[in-house]
Amino acid sequence: MSVIAPSLGKSLLLIGASRGLGFAMAEEYLRLGWNVVATIRSESQSKLAGLGQAFKGRLEIETVDITLPSEVTALRARLASRTFDLLFVNAGVKNDDRETIADVSTDEFVRVIVTNALSPMRVIEAFQDLVPPTGTIGVMTSGLGSVANNQAGSYEVYRASKAALNTLMRSFAARHAGDPRAMLLMAPGWVRTDMGGVQAPLSVEESIPKLASTVNAQQGKAGLQYLDYLGRTVPW
């Protein structure tokens, strides 16, 4: 059984924690002693309430659909008086893996790109001022978002959405040149989740604790980094 650390007084705003990697991140940071505000899209889809029982007083659950700007604005208003040592956005959907850019419908392409690229960056724009100069701003990307590493093709729409996210985050960092905060694009590896599938080589338990350790080790390192869960730099 994992040891649960006492409260450290540090705070995380985790956007997208209803299941999979996001849920595991919420659990890991609670175990590390952080106070966590975690968001879900629908209360009926989340197991987070169970974590709230296990970590009494250190988990708050908010509901938001980040693809709806009005809901993002409302959440920002609810949290206006708060500060967070770490803002981390975890959002991801994919289309049929076999669809090429020639096959995908416009509506499906828009759904994936809005969820995976536009909406996470809107959240970062809305909430970044709640992160102090010593804090960290991070977003879950994918190794498939690397243009340099795209030798095999496949997953065309998903790759494009994560590459777009990486580019938008890089533009955000350029616009905030001189910002002392750490900024991170985190690639968790291919993990066995509902989205990753049963054939993925990594378990959630093999990825997320190491990813959290990597994120925490970057505190105080200004500028943007694109890292995998082990802390290795991913080529752009």
PLM regions and their residue ranges:
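Conserved N-terminal Rossmann-fold NAD(P)-binding element of oxidoreductases
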Residues: 12-16
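N-terminal Rossmann NAD(P)H-binding glycine-rich loop of SDR-like oxidoreductase domains
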Residues: 18, 22-28
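Conserved glycine-rich Rossmann-like NAD(P)H-binding loop of the short-chain dehydrogenase/reductase
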Residues: 32-48
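Rossmann-fold cofactor-recognition segment
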Residues: 53-70
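Conserved Rossmann-fold cofactor-binding substructure of NAD(P)-dependent oxidoreductases
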Residues: 65-82
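Catalytic loop of short-chain dehydrogenase/reductase
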Residues: 93, 97-113, 121, 128-129, ...
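C-terminal helical subdomain
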Residues: 178, 185-186, 197-236
